[in-house]
Amino acid sequence: AILLVEDSVRYYSTYLPELYKLILKQSAEFLKETLNEQQRKGRKRSRPKILLATNLDDAMIFYEKYKNNLLGVISDVGFVRHKEDSPDKEQLDAGIELVRYIRKDDPLMPVLLQSSQDAMSAVAQELGVGFIRKWSKTLMIQLGEYIKEEFGFGDFVFRDAERIEYGRASNLKDMEYLVKTIPDDVLIYNTSKNMFSKWF
């Protein structure tokens, strides 16, 4: 699952179709590899779901319920704490509180913060999470690139700790070959970051 935390109808109406497109594209790629009809049906049923939370309480509930199956989290910085709160009670750092909670529980969980405030970029960097500016003309491109890179969509890219690329697998045959040929330290780095489970 992907957890989207956003209280603006405008933004979640923009994000949801893009997320669905990425999921369907990834599912189609995986379906090319399945061997029989039963496996194909299983893959279709197991494609990631998108969980939409519009307040901090729901975000925490979704995180706790699905954390073992989350590919990542995309969160606004400011939103209300409780479902029944009016918009004027928006907590300007609710997203930061959520990120700290998630990081304490799972330091490897990919998280993307989004805000219209440029200053939040430094906060995201300090927290070790991605950041996109809401008003950016390339918002959807940045969102797609982050998801492909961090949520395990697209090719599996073997990188070392310095982010140097050692190989790219677009299917299981490529993966099998690369696992046998890349340096051991690169393989260990990728397994220690829990990257395989997201791609498979």
Predicted feature descriptions by range:
Residues 1-10, 15-40, 50-52:
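Conserved acidic segment of CheY-like receiver
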Residues 73-75, 96-120, 132:
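A short, hydrophobic beta-strand element within the central beta-sheet of small alpha/beta folds
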Residues 8-12, 57-58, 78-85, 117-120, ...:
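Short acidic, S/G/P-rich loop/turn micro-motifs used as interaction or catalytic elements
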Residues 61, 82-108:
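Short amphipathic alpha-helix used as the core "switch/output" element in two-component signaling
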Residues 18-22, 90, 127-131:
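Short secondary-structure boundary/capping segments
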Residues 30-72, 79-82:
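Acidic, metal-coordinating helix/loop segments flanking the phosphotransfer/catalytic sites
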Residues 116-200:
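Long, compositionally biased intrinsically disordered regulatory segments in eukaryotic proteins
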Residues 59-65, 101, 142, 146:
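CheY-like receiver
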